[in-house]
Amino acid sequence: MVICKTGHVAALKACYYFGIEVRIVGYNKNYEMDVKEMKSKIDSDTICVYTSYPNYPYGTIDPIDQIAPYCSKKNIPVHVNMCLGGFLVPFLKSETTEKGFNFPKGVTSVSLDPHKYGLSAKGASVSLFSD
């Protein structure tokens, strides 16, 4: 699995439990996944690219509009972690969030935590998968 340094530690923990190789990518000057470096980490053994919308350390959104189309061409699933901002960021008005919310082809799953901003019970979580 390819993941940015800013990705949530729970993804790393899951990879450890399931014996999945992790390839960590750096971030650019805006604290978003470095797409060029991400491309260099992908090979035939890559099972997923893990992105954040937004990430926990900085609150920035990975460039999903660049990542998903590239991965789609290579038949690599893209997961978007929206646990922190899934019930908040889509409703903010800015060029970045409006552009990033309409996920391009290639995004195969998202995760959301309604307990953060969705007024749900603590520990509630949602995973959505494309068909």
Task: Give the residues covered by each predicted segment.
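Conserved PLP-enzyme active-site core in the AAT-like
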Residues: M1-D131
